[in-house]
């Protein structure tokens, strides 16, 4: 039976390295055949917003194509694809209360709405839990 890792993250996209670090940990766990639960709350519910768009960098004079600005929605979508390829589970819950406060409900495919009871259950059932707070 595969091991399970639960990660709780609250850092919004593009604010610090915390969300990127969380996604790298998730990626590494999935590649090792570990099931991963993600509980996104506070600003982290914006990591999966479908309406994110790459942008040019007018300071450097680069176009969207030249800038190749990644979006967190693409990173999260690639994690769901990786889980599928590896035959492991990625369960991503966006805190419904946090989503409602922010109007952040238009997500890519994969994440689902939930709340603290899922996190509580996951912490009890997981082999390890990592909490990545915001500053």
Describe the role of every protein-language-model region.
Residues 2-6:
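Extreme N-terminal starter segment of soluble prokaryotic enzymes
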Residues 35-42, 92-96:
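Short internal beta-strands
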Residues 56-94:
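A glycine-rich helix N-cap at a beta->alpha junction
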Residues 108, 117-135:
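Glycine-rich, aromatic-bearing surface loops/beta-hairpins
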């Amino acid at each position: 039976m595969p091991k399970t890792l639960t990660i709780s993250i609250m850092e919004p996209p593009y604010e610090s390295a915390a969300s990127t670090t969380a996604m790298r940990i998730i990626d590494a766990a999935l590649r090792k055949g570990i099931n991963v639960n993600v509980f996104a709350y506070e600003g982290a519910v914006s990591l999966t917003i479908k309406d994110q768009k790459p942008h040019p960098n007018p300071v450097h004079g680069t176009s969207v194509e030249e800038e190749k600005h990644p979006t967190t929605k693409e990173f999260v979508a690639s994690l769901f694809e990786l889980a599928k390829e590896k035959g492991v589970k990625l369960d991503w819950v966006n805190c419904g209360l946090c989503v409602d406060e922010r109007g952040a409900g238009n997500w890519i495919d994969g994440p689902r709405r939930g709340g603290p009871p899922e996190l509580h259950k996951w912490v009890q059932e997981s082999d390890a839990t990592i909490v990545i707070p915001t500053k």
